Amino acid sequence: MGVLWDDSILEYICLSNYRESHMVRLGDTVPNFTQASTYGDIDFYEWAGDSWVVLFSHPADFTPVCTTELGTVAKLKPEFDKRNVKAIALSVDNVESHKGWVGDIEETQSTTLNYPILADADRKVSDLYDMIHPNANAAVTVRSVFVIDPNKKLRLTFTYPPSTGRNFDELLRVIDSLQLTDNYSVATPADWKDGEDVVIVPSLKDPEVLKQKFPKGYEEVKPYLRLTPQPNK
């Protein structure tokens, strides 16, 4: 006798399969969208242009952790600009709510909000980017971060619990690593910071090529672990 499935189980399986097939993974081209924001309607691809993008969601407007996060991102604009990065925030609140909250952010965080907040009231973007946990409140986006490169490829995702604010210094560190390793045959070791030694990718073995690519030389700790000064410094 076959297994009998009730409607709730079938619905769960269908939803799980749908979510799995629509998840955006590292290296994927992220989907485009048009959505309302505090800066008017935004066509994401057009707005992003040739920049890197930090797209980050927050659970709700007028909440304490999110207020500090959006203020921090505004203060970091000079650092984002140096790296050719645009920031854009998102929650499922409407534009009027966002605009009311902006005043609180600017007052309490002593800054000017200098980037758009997407008003994803219809959950269009949240669903595209899988920002709503299946077992959580459907009206609350998780605290996610997406780093997207100029080719519209997803390069990094972070997901934080609602109780924990994001570490934006770590976000800048990872962007530094991505931009460096896109242009040089290196990787960045644990706890690396801009200006510190990096490691040569193991696939490079030809001594002449190594000499050409790394004129400052390198230290071979193991054949697969070779340290060299950061090449763009």
Segments predicted by a language model, with ranges:
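Chalcogenol-based redox active-site neighborhoods
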Residues: 5, 12-233
